[in-house]
Amino acid sequence: MKHDPHLLDDYIKHILAAIERIQRYCADANELAFLENDMLQDAVIRNFEVIGEASKNIDHKFPNFLKQHPSLPLIDAYEMRNALAHGYFKVDLEILWKTINNHLPDLQEQLKNLRN
């Protein structure tokens, strides 16, 4: 089945928009503030779910794209989405905070470079 290549760019835009929202939500927070703010956590988790769902769609609909860009951690993003969506109250918020600060900027840069 052939898929519309414009959809690939749409999925990438969804991921980038979710990353930007997470960064905006957390811009004025340090780790302690994040760990104490359940509304912020919920907003961030929701956007990680968006990232994971778009990543899954890229993997399923455009498998050659991931083969061409093996350094993109989109499978990891989908697995994280599953852990968040099905972990309920077992989410490790410290890992989530580290992911926000240590991994999202790299993913954002990689995807922006692919779009240029």
Q: Could you tell me what each predicted segment is?
A:
Residues M1-N116:
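Solvent-exposed interaction patches of small proteins and small membrane subunits
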